[in-house]
């Protein structure tokens, strides 16, 4: 279904409700630059990590799993002995993800809960695609520490985020380029403006430097930029 949510006034802050869940796949592909390329990189680096895993049944988490697209791609590419768990705070997203998994006969578990309250199991891989930016900034380090503690030695965290620049002019230019990208995907200026207003104080991005510093402070031994396009980036961090 095509994303037309912001063609009219929604009169509230952005939230991952049933209306958003119904068009979320289209919203992702039209709102996140090079979405499919990043997904392909995630599958590749998860595969590399699991090749050296010593876990009898490796565990992969997707935090903010939305409609399950990432875990579905991983389940089709990785060993059948891998356990997949998706966590999301939106029941509407969980319901849609579960239906997709059933349709593809994929063995994926989905849990509806708050990430900040969840007790992570020992895991080999944790993916957080465009989800940390919706966590209050002061709460992100504690969540990342829980993730780090649950990861096995050699395990990885993959983080994709919208990012800011500390340079005022460059930040404005990057925003302008992203607006142009969304227009190229068929969104109108009005839709773009309304969504930006709805996301105000809901999505709080960090800079690339801030994200890397936060991961270093947690204790990750290696952190690299896996992908970067203007104000979007994907990081991989190894324990």
UniProtKB/Swiss-Prot annotation:
Pfam families reported in the protein's UniProt record: Methyltransf_25 (PF13649)
* Record flagged with keyword Lyase: no
EC category: transferase
Record keywords, A-Z:
S-adenosyl-L-methionine, Transferase
Record-level GO BP terms: tRNA wobble uridine modification
| EC number(s) given by UniProt | 2.1.3.-
Known catalytic reactions: prephenate + S-adenosyl-L-methionine = carboxy-S-adenosyl-L-methionine + 3-phenylpyruvate + H2O
> Binding of S-adenosyl-L-methionine: at which residues?
35, 64-66, 114-115, 129, 196
Record flagged with keyword Ribosomal protein: no
Cite a single GO MF annotation.
Answer: carboxyl- or carbamoyltransferase activity
| Annotated InterPro entries | CmoA, Methyltransf_25, SAM-dependent_MTases_sf
Q: Which function does this protein serve? A: Catalyzes the conversion of S-adenosyl-L-methionine (SAM) to carboxy-S-adenosyl-L-methionine (Cx-SAM).
Q: How does it assemble?
A: Homodimer.
According to its UniProt record, which protein family does this protein belong to? Belongs to the class I-like SAM-binding methyltransferase superfamily. Cx-SAM synthase family.
The name of this protein is Carboxy-S-adenosyl-L-methionine synthase
Provenance organism: Helicobacter hepaticus (strain ATCC 51449 / 3B1)
Gene symbol?
A: cmoA
